[in-house]
Amino acid sequence: MSSLVTPQHAEELSTGARQLGVELSAEQHERLLGYLALLIKWNKAYNLTAVRDPDEMVSRHLLDSLSVMGFIHPDRDSWLDVGSGGGMPGIPLAILHPQKRVTVLDANGKKTRFLTQVKMELKLDNLTVIHSRVEAFQPAQPFNGIISRAFSSMENFTNWTRHLGDTGTQWLAMKGLHPADELVALPADFTVESEQALTVPGCQGQRHLLILRRKA
């Protein structure tokens, strides 16, 4: 274990994952802690996250990401994390689902350099890192799932990623407060499939997940 990661961090991750109903293998637990160590190390120079205190990163980043894993459909094997930043939730998604192809996209070159380093050091062969504005990204095939965490408004999220999915794609938007005002401006060809209130161990404040579909 890296000297940047404490036994308390390891225990908090184990306990929090159990509370979320997420079963972590020893390898997944080790990789998540390895990711945490890289995040702590690189954040000092690269400003990857506004969370400066390493003791807050387990709950606010790792467990927050794990809180949506139960909504990742087992049959959807290609996922895009839009505006991934420091890699949430894309890196935990790639660690927990090695059989799925996960793409993390960000327009900030420093952040994609960090994500590339994470891919190399953690040997995440199922992870692809893309340095691009989302509007300019043109994948060969539509993604089965598109996810974002605090990326933008619901209107922008759906409009900017419309070309990256199709009517079979699920869009997952991770939010804090329920975005009722944003849903009013949702494009007419998108519909809310479900809304989930999430409880993240160690996190104060509201968390919500909205799952969207595009109409045929």
From Swiss-Prot:
Instruction: Give the GO molecular function terms.
Output: rRNA (guanine-N7-)-methyltransferase activity
InterPro entries in the record: rRNA_ssu_MeTfrase_G, SAM-dependent_MTases_sf
Task: Give the enzyme's EC designation.
Answer: 2.1.1.170
- One Pfam family from the record: GidB
What is the first-listed, main subcellular location in coarse terms?
Answer: cytoplasm
SUPFAM superfamilies in UniProt: S-adenosyl-L-methionine-dependent methyltransferases
Q: Which residues bind S-adenosyl-L-methionine?
A: G83, M88, V134, E135, R149
Q: What class of enzyme is it?
A: transferase
Compartments annotated for it: namely: Cytoplasm
- Which GO CC annotations does the UniProt entry carry? cytosol
Catalytic activity, as annotated: guanosine(527) in 16S rRNA + S-adenosyl-L-methionine = N(7)-methylguanosine(527) in 16S rRNA + S-adenosyl-L-homocysteine
Alphabetic keyword roster: Cytoplasm, Methyltransferase, rRNA processing, S-adenosyl-L-methionine, Transferase
Keyword rRNA processing part of the UniProt annotation:
yes
Job of this protein: Specifically methylates the N7 position of guanine in position 527 of 16S rRNA.
Protein family membership: Belongs to the methyltransferase superfamily. RNA methyltransferase RsmG family.
HAMAP family the UniProt entry points to:
16SrRNA_methyltr_G (MF_00074)
The molecule here is called Ribosomal RNA small subunit methyltransferase G
